[in-house]
């Protein structure tokens, strides 16, 4: 056993013992200032990202709206193949009477074109429920007329109900003509009351002639031929009481041409160009639009 020696080698050694203050420093959380900075940064990021997310969603809704019109266009063209003409814009059944020795529909504003193409929109069952010898608002057509048809609704319209007066709403109207350059409301479009229009009746060309367009004003029903209109205003500029080309999309509206093509037209489109596009026989030359 060796001699005892003093532990001089530990004389200058300092033991690192954490005090309560050191432990508090190591475990310290966010200060209020730091928390506010983080919240501010998150707010800025959300503010930057939210418009982009909303724009992406609207782009998707606009595409879905265009797809609706594409379906309607195929239905109209198939109807034309079967009947050698597009459907009449509307037929008045209620006021059918003998005029000058012939049966006439003197005020054709009741059963709509959009009711006649139902079989071509995979709605044959609904088509069989309709009584085409009765008016749109007759008791016989009340149940069928209340059906909501998704192909007739723009996903951007934002309405809380898809019914108007108890009948299914539509956001798409047929083109009767234009009052931009012709104030007397001539029937120079493709959707007329009591008169079916053939492709041969469109000398301006089907690819240059609009047949259906968005009209998201609240009063339109797919069974009621009040869903045809003449164009009198620039796109998205008509007052609420006027049926015209109006959408809930920013900057323009979706339109369907008689060849089945769908075009998103800017609300900045010159009204004279718009007037040329909605007439079937104006003889105008239209460039890019």
Model-derived features with residue positions:
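Surface-exposed loop/linker segments characteristic of extracytoplasmic
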Residues: 8, 44, 48, 59-289
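Generic low-polarity alpha-helical segments
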Residues: 1, 7, 16, 20, ...
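Intrinsically disordered, low-complexity sequence elements enriched in Ser/Thr/Gly/Pro
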Residues: 3, 21-22, 26, 55, ...
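N-terminal leader/signal peptides at the extreme start of proteins
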Residues: 1-30, 93-99
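N-terminal single-pass transmembrane signal-anchor helix
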Residues: 26-61, 71
């Amino acid at each position: 056993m060796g001699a005892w020696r003093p532990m001089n080698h530990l004389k200058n050694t300092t033991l690192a013992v954490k005090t309560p203050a050191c432990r508090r420093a190591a475990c310290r959380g966010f200060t209020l200032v730091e928390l506010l900075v983080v919240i501010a940064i998150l707010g800025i990021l959300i503010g930057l990202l939210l418009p982009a997310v909303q724009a992406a969603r609207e782009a998707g809704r606009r595409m879905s709206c265009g797809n609706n019109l594409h379906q309607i266009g195929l239905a109209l063209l198939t109807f034309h193949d079967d009947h050698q003409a597009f459907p009449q814009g509307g037929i008045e059944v209620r006021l059918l009477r003998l005029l000058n020795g012939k049966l006439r529909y003197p005020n054709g504003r009741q059963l709509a074109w959009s009711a006649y193409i139902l079989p071509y929109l995979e709605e044959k069952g609904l088509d069989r429920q309709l009584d085409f010898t009765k008016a749109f608002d007759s008791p016989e057509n009340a149940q069928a007329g209340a059906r909501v048809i998704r192909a007739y609704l723009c996903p951007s319209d934002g309405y809380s109900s898809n019914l108007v007066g108890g009948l299914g709403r539509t956001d798409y109207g047929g083109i009767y003509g234009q009052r931009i350059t012709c104030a007397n409301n001539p029937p120079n479009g493709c959707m007329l009351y009591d008169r079916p229009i053939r492709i041969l009746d469109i000398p301006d060309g089907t690819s240059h002639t609009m047949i259906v367009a968005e009209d998201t004003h609240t009063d339109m029903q797919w069974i009621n031929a009040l869903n045809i209109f003449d164009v009198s205003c620039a796109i998205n500029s008509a007052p609420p009481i006027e049926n015209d080309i109006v959408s809930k999309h920013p900057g323009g509206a979706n339109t369907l041409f008689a060849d089945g093509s769908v075009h998103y037209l800017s609300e900045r489109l010159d009204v004279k160009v718009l007037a040329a596009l909605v007439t079937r026989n104006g003889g105008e030359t239209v460039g890019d639009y």
